[in-house]
């Protein structure tokens, strides 16, 4: 990313943030809804500075507290919606959260970035993936695409289909990516292990990634892996999103894997 492009994006975001801050006309109304929360939920809402982990059982109102916290930040703390990121695990949950926030604060709520981990990463990568040697028009491979690609690799390498199954190999690769284990790291561990099977899978993992990049494609797990790689290799891009997302909330945080945890940690490391 060129410096001019970075400066332009920062300026654009600043202008939008100022616009929303000067158009919040319902400040104080959120407190009426706040009174319907139980004491523990209220504590979670009022804690606006520094890390906070909310642990509670299913159906206890964690998501409700999170959406009220978003509204409280905007209406009572005068935080720009532009600076708030709320992450969920499913598109359905993201849609429900948007509806809840809109119900609490119609003014400016649309500018709160509510999304799943993967949709967040897609938007970031569409903008900056050229820094990693991909084109911004990259394809996202679904399960069928992945299986077709792996079948091609199996055929060309004359892999015994009785000993190795495409679905099984892809599952192992997916698990490795979720733990941010690169093909090189996987190969190193397989050599230490001494297993011929693990070494074969390491070769398949390596070739699979080579083919994906050649096709200008990412699989679902790559969306997280490549966003983490982007942030770690391009400090100016990370800084841009750290400035953008000064308040980050993750629904069902206890379910995050290593890649998701690393992504959130990088984004939140500047403002804690």
Residue ranges, per PLM feature:
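SF2 helicase catalytic motif II
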Residues: 243-258
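Short amphipathic alpha-helical boundary/capping segments
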Residues: 32-36, 57, 156, 160
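A basic/glycine-biased coupling hinge at the interface between accessory DNA-binding modules
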Residues: 3, 8, 14-28, 49-52, ...
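N-terminal pre-P-loop "Q-motif" helix
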Residues: 34-48
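Walker A/P-loop
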Residues: 50-68
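Conserved RecA-like helicase ATPase core segment
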Residues: 32-36, 52, 62, 72, ...
């Amino acid at each position: 990313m060129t410096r001019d492009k970075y400066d332009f994006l920062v300026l654009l975001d600043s202008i939008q943030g100022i616009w929303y801050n000067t158009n919040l006309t319902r400040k104080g109304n959120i407190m009426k809804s706040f009174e319907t929360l139980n004491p523990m939920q209220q504590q979670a809402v009022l804690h606006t500075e520094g890390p906070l982990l909310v642990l509670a059982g299913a159906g206890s109102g964690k998501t409700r507290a999170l959406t009220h916290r978003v509204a409280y930040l905007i209406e009572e703390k005068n935080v720009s919606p532009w600076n708030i990121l709320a992450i969920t695990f499913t598109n359905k949950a993201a849609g429900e959260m948007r509806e809840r926030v809109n119900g609490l604060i119609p003014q400016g709520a649309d500018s709160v970035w509510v999304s799943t981990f993967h949709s967040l990463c897609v938007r970031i990568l569409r903008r900056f993936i050229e820094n990693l040697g991909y084109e911004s028009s990259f394809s996202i491979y679904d399960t069928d695409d992945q299986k077709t690609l792996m079948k091609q690799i199996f055929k060309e390498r004359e892999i015994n289909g009785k000993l190795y199954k495409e679905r099984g190999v892809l599952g192992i690769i997916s698990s490795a990516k979720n733990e941010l284990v690169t093909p090189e790291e996987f190969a190193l561990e397989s050599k230490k292990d001494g297993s011929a099977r693990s070494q074969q899978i390491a070769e398949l993992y390596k070739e699979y990634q080579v083919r994906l990049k050649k096709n200008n494609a990412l699989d679902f797990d790559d969306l997280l892996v490549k966003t983490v790689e982007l942030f770690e290799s391009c400090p100016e891009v990370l800084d841009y999103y750290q400035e953008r997302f000064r308040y980050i909330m993750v629904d069902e945080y206890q379910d995050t894997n290593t890649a998701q945890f690393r992504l959130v940690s990088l984004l939140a490391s500047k403002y804690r």
